[in-house]
């Protein structure tokens, strides 16, 4: 029993002296300075180390481990290591770790969340007119490059706040997004107003507001109608009046209206309709058209490259055949010339040898004939010489 009590008494101070394993969350806006603090109660024979979310060492005690000057040492002592990261970006998000080395190794994790506040909203209005004479106003409120996605609502006549059809489009990195909210107004009064309100965590309770007054839209429509009427009277050619505020003629039937699914809110001055598919459908069509065009161009380019490669291969085969034929012809010509020279030399050698033999035989025959004549003449002279003395006697 006493042994257990003593063990517990020795264990509690060690736990208080060491760095507790826990996770802390820090939220910071993009462009601000991030401060990371690591504090322990131990003061002797201990070391502190900060690690990036990717696992690289930032500082080991007061010694920097990275050449990146983005991380700066704020304070170092035996029981504290604090660093700063100025001008924070979305790439600095993640879980940073502080390691405390003493008799054992303990870890403190700091989860850093970087917020990107939305830009000032842009509000656009357009009038759509159908063949049956009905018309409605489409309001689009958009903001760009925010993280996380903002919340967009519509304030009708300073009394009622509703939500429209919201579309979020994330950028290629998957972090920031562009948000658009669409609201369709079927009926409105001249003094009616609509405000686009944007809320976001990075705004810290503040709101971004883009107001719209329908009296400006009515004034623009009346001005455009008067100008068109004057032009029609002067040219004696009646025309239908159009609005300069993005007026669109819609030739579709009421079946399209049945396919639209919105939230409907009625007011004494306003009847609203939220269309979450209006902007998405148009962008989807344009995206499909662009993708089809790019695919067709890539296919044409692929065919051209294949034809060029085939032409190069054909030319290479023809050149190779011609080269082989020329080499074969040259070798045959060389072998033929060598054979002719060899045969001519053999013929010359064979014809000269009999001639030499004939000349030698002729020479021997002539010499033998000459000697024979000389012997005959000599024998005749001897016979004459012998016969003369006998006659004298």
Curated annotation (Swiss-Prot):
Signal peptide limits: 1-17
One of the protein's GO biological processes: establishment of T cell polarity
Record motif PDZ-binding, residues: 390-393
Ig-like V-type domain location: 18-114
PROSITE patterns with a match to the protein in the record: IG_LIKE
Region feature Disordered, mapped onto this chain: 225-273, 328-354, 374-393
Major subcellular location class: membrane
Membrane-protein topology: Single-pass type I membrane protein
Polar residues composition-biased segments: 231-241
SMART domains named in the record: IG
Residues on Extracellular side: 18-287
Bilayer-crossing regions: 288-308
All residue ranges annotated as the Ig-like C2-type domain in the record: 118-210
InterPro entries in alphabetical order: CD80_C2-set (IPR013162), CRTAM (IPR053096), Ig-like_dom (IPR007110), Ig-like_dom_sf (IPR036179), Ig-like_fold (IPR013783), Ig_sub (IPR003599), Ig_V-set (IPR013106)
Tissue: In the immune system, expression is restricted to activated class-I MHC-restricted cells, including NKT and CD8 T-cells. Strongly expressed in spleen, thymus, small intestine, peripheral blood leukocyte, and in Purkinje neurons in cerebellum. Expressed at much lower levels in testis, ovary, colon, lung and lymphoid tissues.
GO molecular function: identical protein binding; signaling receptor binding
Phenotypic consequence of residue 101 to A: Reduced binding to CADM1. Severely impairs interaction with CADM1
Keywords: Adaptive immunity, Cell adhesion, Cell membrane, Disulfide bond, Glycoprotein, Immunity, Immunoglobulin domain, Membrane, Repeat, Signal, Transmembrane, Transmembrane helix
Assembly notes: Monomer. May form homodimer (via Ig-like V-type domain). Interacts (via Ig-like V-type domain) with CADM1 (via Ig-like V-type domain); the interaction competes with CRTAM homodimerization and CADM1 homodimerization. Interacts (via PDZ-binding motif) with SCRIB (via PDZ domain 3); the interaction promotes CRTAM and SCRIB polarization in a subset of CD4+ T-cells.
Function field: Mediates heterophilic cell-cell adhesion which regulates the activation, differentiation and tissue retention of various T-cell subsets. Interaction with CADM1 promotes natural killer (NK) cell cytotoxicity and IFNG/interferon-gamma secretion by CD8+ T-cells in vitro as well as NK cell-mediated rejection of tumors expressing CADM1 in vivo. Regulates CD8+ T-cell proliferation in response to T-cell receptor (TCR) activation. Appears to be dispensable for CD8+ T-cell-mediated cytotoxicity.
Listed name of the protein: Cytotoxic and regulatory T-cell molecule
Organism, scientific name: Homo sapiens
Organism lineage: Eukaryota, Metazoa, Chordata, Craniata, Vertebrata
């Amino acid at each position: 029993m006493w042994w257990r009590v003593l063990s517990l008494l020795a264990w509690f101070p060690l736990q208080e002296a060491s760095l507790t394993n826990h996770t802390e969350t820090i939220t910071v806006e993009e462009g601000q300075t991030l401060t990371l603090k690591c504090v322990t109660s131990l003061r002797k024979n201990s070391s502190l180390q900060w690690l990036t979310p990717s696992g690289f060492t930032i500082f080991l005690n007061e010694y920097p481990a990275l050449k990146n000057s983005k991380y700066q040492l704020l304070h170092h002592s035996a029981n504290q290591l604090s660093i700063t990261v100025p001008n924070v970006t979305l790439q600095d998000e993640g879980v940073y770790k502080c390691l405390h080395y003493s008799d054992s190794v303990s870890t403190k994790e700091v989860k850093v969340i970087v917020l990107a506040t939305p830009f000032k909203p842009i509000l656009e209005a357009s009038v759509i007119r159908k063949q049956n004479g009905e018309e409605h106003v489409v309001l689009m409120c958009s903001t760009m490059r925010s993280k996380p996605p903002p919340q967009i609502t519509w304030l009708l006549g300073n009394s009622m706040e509703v939500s429209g059809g919201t579309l979020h489009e994330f950028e290629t990195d998957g972090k920031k997004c562009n948000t658009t909210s669409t609201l369709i107004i079927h009926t409105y009064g001249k003094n009616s107003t609509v405000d686009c309100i944007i809320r976001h965590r990075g705004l810290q309770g503040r709101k971004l507001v883009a107001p719209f007054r329908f009296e400006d839209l009515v004034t623009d429509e009346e001005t455009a109608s008067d100008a068109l009427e004057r032009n029609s009277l002067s040219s004696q050619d009646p025309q239908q009046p159009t609005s300069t505020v993005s007026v669109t003629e819609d030739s579709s039937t009421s079946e399209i209206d049945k396919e639209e699914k919105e939230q409907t809110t009625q007011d004494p001055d306003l009847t609203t309709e939220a269309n979450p598919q209006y902007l998405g459908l148009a962008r989807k069509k344009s995206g499909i058209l662009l993708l089809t065009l790019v695919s067709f161009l890539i296919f044409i380019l692929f065919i051209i490259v294949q034809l060029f490669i085939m032409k190069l291969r054909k030319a290479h085969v023809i050149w190779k055949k011609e080269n082989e034929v020329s080499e074969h012809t040259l070798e045959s010509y060389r072998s033929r010339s060598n054979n002719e020279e060899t045969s001519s030399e053999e013929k010359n050698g064979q014809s000269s040898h009999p001639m030499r033999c004939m000349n030698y035989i002729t020479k021997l025959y002539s010499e033998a004939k000459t000697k024979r004549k000389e012997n005959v003449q000599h024998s005749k002279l001897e016979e004459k010489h012998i016969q003369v003395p006998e006659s004298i006697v």
